[in-house]
Swiss-Prot record:
Official protein name in the record: Ribosomal RNA large subunit methyltransferase M
Species name: Yersinia pestis bv. Antiqua (strain Angola)
Gene3D superfamilies (alphabetical): 3.30.2300.20, 3.30.70.2810, Vaccinia Virus protein VP39
E.C. designation(s): 2.1.1.186
Primary site of residence: cytoplasm
Gene behind the chain: rlmM
UniProt subunit comment: Monomer.
Residues annotated as the enzyme's active site: 307
Its job: Catalyzes the 2'-O-methylation at nucleotide C2498 in 23S rRNA.
Statement: the UniProt record of this protein carries the keyword Cytoplasm: yes
UniProt GO cellular component terms: cytoplasm
Gene Ontology biological-process annotations: methylation; rRNA processing
Example GO molecular function: S-adenosylmethionine-dependent methyltransferase activity
Family of the protein in this entry: Belongs to the class I-like SAM-binding methyltransferase superfamily. RNA methyltransferase RlmE family. RlmM subfamily.
Amino acid sequence: MNNKIALYCRSGFEKECAAEITEKAAQLEIFGFARVKENSGYVLFECYQLEDADRLIREIPFREFIFARQMMVVGELLKDLPPEDRVSPIVGMLVGVIEKAGELRVEVADTNESKELLKFCRKLTVPLRSALREQKILSARENAHRPVVHVFFIAPGCCYVGYSYSNNNSPFYMGIPRLKFPSDAPSRSTLKLEEAFHVFIPADEWEERLASGMHAVDLGACPGGWTYQLVQRSMMIQAVDNGLMAQSLMDTGQVTHNRADGFKYEPTRSNIYWLVCDMVEKPTKVTQLITKWLVNGWCREAIFNLKLPMKKRYEEVVQNLAMMDEQLKENGINADIHAKQLYHDREEVTVHVRRIWSGAPGRRDERY
């Protein structure tokens, strides 16, 4: 009975993920209940009506989720798969449910316990893929435009089987982009900004929106983890921080170091495209700072991190995003605002804002 959806999330953030899916489902007048097991790395949402699970994964835009890394419709838990034939029961769950899917992903939750199953998942994938193709459940070749079959193992011999839609899911295995830490980067935080680019900016827009020669500002830049990503894309960067910047970045000639407080700094040039900010400060204070930059027209796009409190983390994020949205609208500014708890985030979320410049008289056009 496929009336459930499974959502992957960061271990320890199951309650936030559950609150989010419950709220978004209710907005569509779809009702059910979330099953939460702490530190499991996933949430199940069981709908009261049978067809509603499929409707949820079609109608809730995946990019609007903050805490969910992936979402899929699943059936009942398959338990005690026979060691001599694990494939047949899985295939049986999908017969009549989906046809000619474009991809198979045999996955686990992102926890230390579950990762021990990854080797088994890789081993199972090849025979399972062949069997699914034989039954026409999977297309003969991978197809990025067709649904994805998910087999989600929660324990040895126990899995959920289901599907997601490729136009409304995470394109990444386990919902996690695989990024390699560059050995010459000043800090591991560099991966947060790189992942944010992958998550928030479509690949076919990188050349236009992450273009060589753009001007950028990094508030709270030291030692330069986020500045590094901008340097790699041949931008010119104002790095704002009272601390020391990595000499390797200064040697590129692309970075100007402003020894100043990121909350007090005001730009001196008018053609800044990107603002990035990863400062350890209260979420409200950071949100107000970025909003000020957007209202003043000091930047076109911004990526920033919000450090989360110990309690009411989902509410905190929602309140800050709503506050920003309201203040921008009060100033007649259109903007796209999205937030995500990235794989490389910890007790924090990353927010992306893109200002959509109006063609009103006296306002700068969006082309610099």
